[in-house]
Design a protein with these regions (language model features):
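Glycine/Thr-rich phosphate-binding loops that ligate phosphate moieties of nucleotide
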Residues: 1-182
Length: 182
């Protein structure tokens, strides 16, 4: 009904897509974000290389404004492709940290994660996220949902449409299911 109350949990990752911009603009190890998917798929193992893109501190669930970025596990064999893949995976690890806390606090298990934004175009990242969460990841056809959400809220407020119509109109581009390698 129009009088029903709905709740949402939100967790902020301060640096997500901006970490891919960092690879491009500061490190200059990619020309554009699209190539990160092919590069990530080109190597099998990361061999314990982790990127923490805390360039502006860490958001949820740590809320540490003093944290700074780091790369762990570098060896002489580490190449640009390892740093690229580890940076992509860092986005999924940050999301997992938030989802774990949300599940604990709400006592509700995640069945499906709906994603948006430029990073969700990356199939490698979305599949890695699905595997890491052991949950379905759903990418919509329209990935810039912030503007669309503002429009939906305006339409709801002005009674142009109702919540059920908005839900019905959501179009899915792709669903990623968890795949666990033996």
């Amino acid at each position: 009904t129009s009088n029903s109350v709905n709740y949402a949990l939100e967790g902020s990752v301060f640096i997500a897509g901006a970490s891919i911009q960092w690879l491009r603009d500061s490190l200059k190890i990619i020309k554009d974000a699209k190539e990160t998917e092919e590069i990530a798929n080109s190597i099998e193992e990361l061999e314990n290389i982790y990127v923490v893109p805390a360039f502006a501190g860490l958001g949820a669930p740590y809320w540490d404004m003093y944290s700074r970025g780091a790369i762990f596990g570098l060896t002489r064999d580490t190449g640009r492709e390892h740093i690229i893949k580890a940076t992509l995976e860092s986005l999924a690890y940050q999301t997992k940290d938030i989802i774990d806390v949300m599940q604990k606090d709400s006592n509700v298990e995640l069945r499906s994660l709906k994603v948006d934004g430029g990073a969700c175009k990356n199939n490698y990242l979305m599949q890695f996220q699905s595997n890491l969460l052991n949950s379905e990841v759903v990418r919509p056809e329209i990935i810039e949902s912030t503007a669309m959400g503002a429009g939906y809220l305006a339409g709801l407020f002005s009674s142009l449409w109702d919540k059920d119509k908005i839900i019905f109109n959501q179009k899915i581009d792709k669903k990623f299911k968890p795949v666990i390698d033996p």
